[in-house]
């Protein structure tokens, strides 16, 4: 396994100008690592929708690198999106999957068949241009240059530890964050889209 | 001009260049025109809520996007509208082929077809029914203009009286 925060720290070194979206409990670490918030976009919240939304974003911005850090719980809700993505072959799309094998935000209940699913095989079978599977930080770090510099869609599955929250939702500490609408406006301003 | 061509022309009029859809025999009359026209980017989705997600992402990049689906598929995608499009203020024209209307042969389509417009009402989504070619251009153009002015999703429900439906 690789700590989610370490995944993001390694990725940040190779981000370049990529537009970055994160999802789920693991994705929250990105806020502490990112250095270009105007190119971060939030399509989370509606679980199961964000993969398709970032796919749509990649189609709309064919000249920008678009990176999505998905989670296995969200992806499983709409697994068919892998076929839709592979069918359109967005060469600018890099799809990471941080797999913590559970629904961490609701208390750590396992996703179905949590320990045995190989998501990179599902992505490969769907027709992604390249797929990877990492369990080791060093191996991941040394592969990032290749991952970020090849034609997509690329899929990268990484096992991460679950960061389970057991506090009732109302008692959890909330980070201040931009609303989804605000991240869309900020990105559009950054890209000079009227 | 056919009803489908009228809709395609209205899409262009409003610079809607990305169409995400789940196929249906009536919708095919529109998507087959779209597919041959280089102005459009036609994206096939495996499920209707996915089509809404794709349209939301495209809108974030400054590209207007519409979705096409059956009423049964609208049933699949209610939370994509309620949880993504509405709170993010993303205008998405949703073209719904309203099944369960005149001439319906499939019992599985009846309940969701009948429930679609009441559900749209409860969600607070404006919707208009397209059931003839009379004033069609005016209705579609007016609805699309409203959709972008209000920055909210809007539905256009197409019935068999418009497109002839499906017989088998």
Protein language model features and the residues they cover:
Chain B
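Thiamine diphosphate
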Residues: 1-168
């Amino acid at each position: 396994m690789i700590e989610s925060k370490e995944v993001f720290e390694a990725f940040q070194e190779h981000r370049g100008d990529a537009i970055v979206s994160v999802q789920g409990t693991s994705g929250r670490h990105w806020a502490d690592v990112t250095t270009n918030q105007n190119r971060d976009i939030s399509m989370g919240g509606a679980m199961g929708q964000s993969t398709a939304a970032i796919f749509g974003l990649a189609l709309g911005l064919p000249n920008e690198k678009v990176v999505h850090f998905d989670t296995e719980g969200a992806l499983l809700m709409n697994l068919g999106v892998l076929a839709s993505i592979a069918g359109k072959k967005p060469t600018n799309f890099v799809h990471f999957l941080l797999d913590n094998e559970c629904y961490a935000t609701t208390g750590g209940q396992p996703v179905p068949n949590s320990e045995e699913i190989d998501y990179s095989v599902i992505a490969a079978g769907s027709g992604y241009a390249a797929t990877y599977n990492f369990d080791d930080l060093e191996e991941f770090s040394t592969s990032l240059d290749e991952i970020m510099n090849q034609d997509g869609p690329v899929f990268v599955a990484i096992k991460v530890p679950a960061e389970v929250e057991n506090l009732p939702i109302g008692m959890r500490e909330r980070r201040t964050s931009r609303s989804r609408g605000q991240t869309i406006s900020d990105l559009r301003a950054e890209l000079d889209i009227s | 001009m056919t009803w489908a061509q009228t809709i395609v022309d209205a899409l262009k009029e409003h610079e809607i260049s990305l169409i995400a859809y789940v196929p249906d025999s009536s919708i095919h009359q529109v998507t087959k025109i779209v597919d041959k026209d280089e102005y459009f980017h036609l994206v096939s989705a495996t499920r209707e809520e996915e089509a809404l997600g794709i349209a939301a992402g495209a809108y974030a990049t400054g590209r207007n996007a519409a979705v096409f689906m059956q009423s049964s598929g609208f049933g699949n995608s209610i939370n994509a509208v309620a949880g993504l499009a509405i709170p993010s203020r993303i205008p998405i024209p949703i073209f719904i082929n309203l099944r369960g209307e005149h001439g319906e042969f499939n019992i599985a389509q009846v309940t969701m077809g009948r429930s679609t417009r009441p559900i749209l009402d409860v969600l607070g989504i404006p919707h208009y029914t397209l059931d003839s070619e009379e004033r069609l251009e005016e209705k579609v153009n007016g609805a699309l203009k409203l959709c972008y002015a209000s920055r909210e999703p809007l539905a256009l429900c197409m019935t068999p009286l418009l497109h002839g439906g499906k017989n088998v």
